[in-house]
Design a protein with these regions (language model features):
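Short His-Asn-centered micro-motif
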Residues: 14-16, 40-41, 85-89, 109-110, ...
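Short, well-ordered alpha-helical microsegments
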Residues: 22, 90-94, 116, 201-204
């Protein structure tokens, strides 16, 4: 089994967007396969070096005349992982499905209104793509969030389109519904599972042809974890508002002390 999975690469690809139960699915897949599952949280918790790899992957795909995903980069990113779900991988499910022809796709689904409410309070605030002051950008870069935010925004634009108005709830809801429909239409039915995590183990294990584990299906709420990240950004924003006036005051004080006194 282990040797076969190593040769196959990714066995499961998640096409469901963030806040659809992907964190619970990650843990479920890790319980089933006894190997790690790639997820957005892997990047900001463990794999910071992957940010540059994902940006390079997206750039190469955009510029590729045949729209093929870079095989070598994918193998570097997913080395040691049995599955890849959530952002940023979900945005490339079509390309990954072609790269790993024996893989299967799990589309985690959720009520659109509930999904949007969850996004607004965590990963997709209305001002996610709005310009920030240089002081805010500087502070965010100092703590390592600048590139992570840039990658996530690039990923969201690949999902929803370059013209998406992230501040508009109706546009976001339509984008979410359209994304799910595109997945359903483009993935062969025998390789696709539409999965609500409230369904538990049975449909997932049946689809993957694996025995049901002797433990409850994991139901993890990543709300608190994501809120901590958002609150950190909010603190940076507040601090950045004081940075420029403080810097100007310091410069004037220095000039006054140096040349006037």
């Amino acid at each position: 089994m282990a040797r076969e999975e190593e040769e196959l690469g990714l066995v499961v690809i998640g096409a469901g967007l963030g806040r659809t139960g992907t964190n619970s699915l990650k843990i479920a897949l890790e319980l089933l396969y006894k190997k790690p599952c790639y997820h957005l949280k892997e990047i900001y918790l463990h794999q910071h070096s992957h940010i540059a790899k994902w940006m390079e992957l997206d750039k190469k795909l955009t510029e590729s005349p045949d729209k093929k995903i870079d095989k070598a980069l994918c193998h570097k990113i997913f080395k040691g992982y049995i599955a890849a779900i959530d952002h940023p991988a979900c945005a490339y499910y079509k390309e990954l499905l072609e790269l790993y022809p024996k893989s299967k796709v799990v589309l985690t689904i959720r009520d659109p209104e509930i999904w949007l409410a969850g996004c607004r309070s965590t990963i997709l605030p209305r001002d996610i793509d709005q310009p920030r002051t240089w002081s805010f950008q500087f502070l965010r870069k100092c703590i390592g969030l600048s590139q992570f935010h840039e990658l996530f925004l690039i990923n969201c634009r690949r999902v929803f389109g370059e013209q998406m108005d992230f501040s508009n709830d109706t546009s976001m809801l339509n984008g979410f519904v359209q994304w799910n429909q595109n997945v359903i239409q483009s993935v062969p039915s025998d390789r696709l599972l539409k999965f609500d995590i409230s369904q538990g183990w049975e449909p997932l294990c049946k689809f993957l042809q694996l025995p049901i584990p002797d433990c409850p299906f994991p139901h993890v709420n990543e709300y608190n974890e994501l809120r901590r990240l958002l609150k950190l950004e909010q603190r940076i924003l507040k601090l950045s508002k004081w940075l420029l006036p403080t810097l100007i005051l310091f410069i004037f004080a220095y000039i006054f002390y140096k040349f006037v006194l």
